[in-house]
Amino acid sequence: MTQDEMKKAAGWAALQYVEEGSIVGVGTGSTVNHFIDALGTMKDKIKGAVSSSIASTEKLEALEIKVFECNDVFKLDIYVDGADEINGSRDMIKGGGAALTREKIVAAISDKFICIVDGTKAVDVLGKFPLPVEVIPMARSYVARELVKLGGDPVYREGCTTDNGNVILDVYGMAIENPKQLEDIINGIAGVVTVGLFAHRGADVVITGTPEGAKIEE
């Protein structure tokens, strides 16, 4: 089974958590794209979706799934999204697709976060994948200096502007032993919009695509 087939297995397995008549939180990325395809088979049974990115919104609308504004929804039953890394405590690094802030907002209004990944994303310690930080453009250099003080090696993601009009610093070289603490510290730096650590709001369910099919951990 290829990596993409494992992503597809995870994405389609998440469909069992979608209830009829609900509004579904939808993340961003290659694994989520498979979930959106699956969701398209239920489009007449759900009210619609809240999307974490312009890219996902376009894919949802192409399948004729109604997309609601986040501000118009009080809460969501589920949010389905991928991760760049996930540890045994279900803390995650997200933001490889630069949608981390909107992903964090949609996750915050959701009762259940369902993380869909292939087996390559599971790690013992977060940080091998560079940690994305969304930054107000005028603060880029200052934030980079502060991240160096924390032991990281921040690299400006060239040619990337987030859906919010900001920039991304990818922080290399961090072995993240205490994700919640680091999330608080980086979010406290002036000019940081958010860091791609999802530790305070980790995953509730993990669906991993494996060569044998989807493995579900609740």
From Swiss-Prot:
Q: Where's the active site on this chain? A: 103
Q: Which pathway?
A: Carbohydrate degradation; pentose phosphate pathway; D-ribose 5-phosphate from D-ribulose 5-phosphate (non-oxidative stage): step 1/1
Keywords per UniProt = Isomerase
Q: CDD domains from the entry?
A: RPI_A (cd01398)
- Provide the residue positions that the database annotates as binding substrate: 28-31, 81-84, 94-97, 121
Alphabetized Pfam families for the sequence: Rib_5-P_isom_A (PF06026)
The molecular function GO annotations come to: ribose-5-phosphate isomerase activity
CC per GO annotation: cytosol
Q: Which InterPro entries match?
A: NagB/RpiA_transferase-like, Ribose5P_isomerase_typA_subgr, Ribose5P_isomerase_type_A
Q: What EC number is given for this enzyme? A: 5.3.1.6
Q: Which PANTHER family match?
A: RIBOSE-5-PHOSPHATE ISOMERASE
Q: What is this protein called?
A: Ribose-5-phosphate isomerase A
Q: Give the organism, scientific name.
A: Vibrio atlanticus (strain LGP32)
